[in-house]
Each structure stands twice: as structure tokens, then as C-alpha cells.
Amino acid sequence: MVRYFRRRKFCRFTVEKIKEIDYKDLSMLKNYITESGKIVPSRITGTSARYQRQLARAIKRARYLSLLPYTDQHQ
């Protein structure tokens, strides 16, 4: 019987020693939202709970300031 092991997910922010997630860093924030505009959960990205909260707060602030769209397209 062959077992397949997934590679362990890691928190990118912990590795890079980032203190605070900035809402103005749109290129980084876009990596953590889906095409439809939803925030990707930490079980998918591997982000730790502390940084997931900061990430959600930064994305919501960027949406409020119209830096990021709430949804991809309105049709």
C-alpha cells in the first residue's frame, strides 16, 4: 500500500518575518482572494491564525477604500 503525503503548508508571513500586513500591498493581497473575490481560508493557504486575521482585515479595508473589488464582475 502506497501512501501519498502532502507537503506541509507553511505561513509565508512567519517565514518572511512580516510584522503587519499592509492593506495597500495589492499584489500580495490578490494572492489570497479567489477570482470571485472571496478570501481564501487558511487551511488552503497555510497561513497562521494571527496572520489570517490580519489578512482578512487588510482585504476588507482595501475593499472599503475601493482598492480591491468585492466581486470580480457584476453581471
Curated annotation (Swiss-Prot):
GO annotation, cellular component aspect: cytosolic small ribosomal subunit
Keyword Phosphoprotein carried by entry: no
InterPro entries: Ribosomal_bS18, Ribosomal_bS18_CS, Ribosomal_bS18_sf
GO-annotated molecular function: small ribosomal subunit rRNA binding; structural constituent of ribosome
Alphabetically ordered keywords of this record: Ribonucleoprotein, Ribosomal protein, RNA-binding, rRNA-binding
Any one Gene Ontology BP term: translation
The organism's place on the tree of life at top rank: Bacteria
Subunit structure: Part of the 30S ribosomal subunit. Forms a tight heterodimer with protein bS6.
Function comment: Binds as a heterodimer with protein bS6 to the central domain of the 16S rRNA, where it helps stabilize the platform of the 30S subunit.
Family matches, as PANTHER family: 30S RIBOSOMAL PROTEIN S18, SMALL RIBOSOMAL SUBUNIT PROTEIN BS18M
Family, per entry: Belongs to the bacterial ribosomal protein bS18 family.
Name used for this protein in its record: Small ribosomal subunit protein bS18
UniProt organism field: Buchnera aphidicola subsp. Baizongia pistaciae (strain Bp)
Taxonomic lineage of the native organism: Bacteria, Pseudomonadati, Pseudomonadota, Gammaproteobacteria, Enterobacterales
